[in-house]
């Protein structure tokens, strides 16, 4: 609020589900959050460190969480829950092109002309080396590729090849970590195909013996 210079600002509470990890000798942070998010009390929220009341009644709070399982029920009762689906593979590729690749190139001192990652290569990385709703693992894999190319450029600048192929990806990262799941074209007697939804936003195929 001090940085925003406004009492009607928007405040982001990132990873609210991590509050439970602070329980113990350091106090209960969820008790303070209950008071902060309660419209009947937050007009005079008192910070025990500063020992002064703060009016939070005009603040719009937006909280994020990876899982609702570790958030106390009283805290969930004070918020409206909106479930956001994980990124699709196409969205991951778009995010990688616009943000992740430029970020890794800048971090390793390389330019766009020195490391060329096509959409097909990025899609292969997303499908074969990551299995998550977000893009953190994909960013790490892209970082591994860029670092390997930086070493190649430093060691052999005259024979360096800037275009990265799927073969280069598998040489640097190893074989695919995840194989694409497909339904058997020919049914097997006594085996049914099911679908599972994971908390990360991903799905999978299950072969169930009846």
Which ranges hold each PLM region?
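Conformational switch/transducer regions in large eukaryotic molecular machines and scaffolds
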Residues: 5, 17, 51, 57, ...
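C-terminal engagement/docking regions of AAA+ P-loop ATPases
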Residues: 132, 136, 140-210
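Hydrophobic aliphatic residues
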Residues: 1, 36-40, 79, 96, ...
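Conserved C-terminal "switch" segment of AAA+ ATPases
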Residues: 2-5, 10, 67-77, 81-143, ...
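Conserved catalytic/switch belt of AAA+ P-loop NTPases
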Residues: 15-55, 77
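AAA+/SF3 P-loop NTPase mechanochemical coupling elements
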Residues: 3-12, 28, 46-65, 115-117, ...
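Residue-level signature of catalytic and energy-coupling elements of molecular machines
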Residues: 14, 33, 64, 92, ...
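Flexible glycine-/small-residue-rich
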Residues: 13-17, 63-66, 77, 83-86, ...
């Amino acid at each position: 609020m001090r940085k925003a210079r406004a009492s009607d600002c928007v405040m982001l509470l990132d990873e609210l589900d991590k509050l439970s990890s602070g329980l113990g000798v350091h106090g209960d942070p969820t008790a303070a959050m209950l008071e902060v998010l309660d419209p009947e009390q937050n007009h005079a929220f008192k910070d025990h460190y500063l020992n002064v009341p703060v009016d939070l009644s005009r603040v719009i709070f937006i909280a994020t969480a990876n899982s609702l399982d570790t958030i106390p029920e009283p805290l969930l009762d004070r918020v409206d829950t909106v479930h956001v689906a994980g990124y699709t593979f196409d969205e991951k590729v778009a995010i990688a092109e616009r943000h992740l690749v430029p970020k890794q190139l800048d971090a390793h001192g390389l330019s766009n002309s020195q490391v060329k990652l096509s959409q097909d290569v990025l899609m292969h990385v997303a499908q074969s080396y990551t299995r998550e709703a977000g893009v953190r693992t994909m960013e790490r894999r892209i970082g591994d590729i860029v670092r390997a190319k930086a070493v190649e450029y430093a060691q052999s600048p005259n024979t360096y090849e800037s275009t990265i192929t799927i073969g280069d990806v598998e040489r640097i990262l190893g074989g695919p970590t995840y194989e694409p799941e497909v339904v058997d074209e020919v049914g097997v007697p006594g085996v049914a195909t099911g679908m599972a939804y994971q908390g990360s936003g991903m799905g999978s195929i299950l072969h169930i013996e009846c």
